Amino acid sequence: MEITAVQSSYYGDMAFKTPPPDLESLLLKERIVYLGMPLFSSDEVKQQVGIDVTQLIIAQLLYLQFDDPDKPIYFYINSTGTSWYTGDAVGFETEAFAICDTLNYIKPPVHTICIGQAMGTAAMILSSGTKGYRASLPHATIVLNQNRTGAQGQATDIQIRAKEVISNKQTMLEILSLNTGQTQEKLAKDMDRTFYLTPAQAKEYGLIDRVLESPAELPKPMAVI
């Protein structure tokens, strides 16, 4: 007599119910990546949150390329990036640069879709999706700004940090200029103060390509050659 193991349903009698997989795994199965919190850099905060957000996002993107390099990836963004709502830094811009580089490195087309908000470096990540595949839901808010940092310590440490801030700002301007078609001078001027954009304004600015009302409006995958 052959005995076959059968996994019970996720729902049923409490005594026999098996725990469902975590939500991230369910989304990943459908090739969906979700950034729904800031990009923290502090190890202490990462331990409190229980996750290294940047590491998880990059690992998911790399896995999806390995899984199928031709199928599109859907990257939903609802994040304040490397800062709080106030603009105070909670992470280094290098966290966001790593995600942008990964988006450009992998082969699958990546739909970046803003839901809720994309602020600062999160807006930069939004703009780094595959051209023609960058979108926002109609009532989201997209914000361009710079992190406010308060360097502490010895004078030499403050000088080193100041150089890093200037270098990161320049890198962010270069990425945004490449993604939007705006000049670095215009971007620097607009980002001197918090710069709010509606999805329609973000489309005109070059941060996204379309405003979505439903999933049916997502662009169709490109033919594999």
Swiss-Prot record:
A biological-process GO annotation: protein quality control for misfolded or incompletely synthesized proteins
Entry's Gene Ontology cellular component terms: endopeptidase Clp complex
SUPFAM superfamilies named in the record: ClpP/crotonase (SSF52096)
GO molecular function: ATP-dependent peptidase activity; ATPase binding; serine-type endopeptidase activity
One Pfam family hit: CLP_protease
UniProt record similarity statement: Belongs to the peptidase S14 family.
Primary role: Has lost the two conserved residues (Ser and His) proposed to be part of the active site. Therefore it could be inactive.
PANTHER family on file: ATP-DEPENDENT CLP PROTEASE PROTEOLYTIC SUBUNIT (PTHR10381), ATP-DEPENDENT CLP PROTEASE PROTEOLYTIC SUBUNIT-LIKE-RELATED (PTHR10381:SF72)
Name of this chain's protein: Putative ATP-dependent Clp protease proteolytic subunit-like
Species annotation: Synechocystis sp. (strain ATCC 27184 / PCC 6803 / Kazusa)
Taxonomic path: Bacteria, Bacillati, Cyanobacteriota, Cyanophyceae, Synechococcales
